[in-house]
């Protein structure tokens, strides 16, 4: 289906429900329909670089828009958590970050910041040769050669800071107490601070373990382990762009 009614679209999309009946439906891709923004809608309604959907489509088709360092010519391409949007011709760069009101929002970043993406390891698999494949949240995979496994055997839910589009790993942030994290789901989405405690459940740890995060204002919030993404050691990584 090429389109979707505005009432059926994800609740967080920045759309006027009374303007038109139909809107763009995101194509299958690295992010779920319920957790993404179609590229053309992002350009028109969030970044304001196009006044009409037709203008947004033209920008995409002409190859002026890059997502995670690669030109995307599909105006329905799904853009989601921590994706980097680059418009080199206008010297504009953005990162999609969690927001407490709008769920996902673009924040302006520098050209230097746009070289990096932050992704969580959702699971790992070991092949018959002893190599480890890291399966990341945005659908990409990184293969760790057998000889490098001892030094690069990252735990699941670790956040990797990678170069894009090369996928070279620059830094890793393991999910543990004392690390700086942002909440990426649930009612406290978008709030961030230092992880004070992690209460691990005996079963279904990601769903039922409780993480307490202390914000910069001193207030604490709690969420499930699966909703937490580490974005720094004791402070935010300077290239993230979260304020």
From Swiss-Prot:
One GO cellular component, as annotated = cytosolic small ribosomal subunit
Checking InterPro entries in the record gives: Rib_uL2_dom2, Ribosomal_eS4, Ribosomal_eS4_central_region, Ribosomal_eS4_central_sf, Ribosomal_eS4_KOW, Ribosomal_eS4_N, S4_RNA-bd, S4_RNA-bd_sf
Q: Which residues form the S4 RNA-binding domain?
A: 37-99
Entry's Gene Ontology BP terms: translation
Recorded GO molecular functions are:
rRNA binding; structural constituent of ribosome
In its keyword annotation, does this UniProt entry include Ribonucleoprotein? Answer: yes
What does UniProt give as the signal peptide span?
none
Ordered alphabetically, the record's keywords are:
Ribonucleoprotein, Ribosomal protein, RNA-binding, rRNA-binding
Which Pfam families does the protein's record reference?
Answer: Ribosomal_S4e, RS4NT, S4
* Domain of life of the organism encoding this protein: Archaea
Q: Which family does it belong to?
A: Belongs to the eukaryotic ribosomal protein eS4 family.
What name has this protein been given in UniProt?
Small ribosomal subunit protein eS4
Give the gene that encodes this protein: rps4e
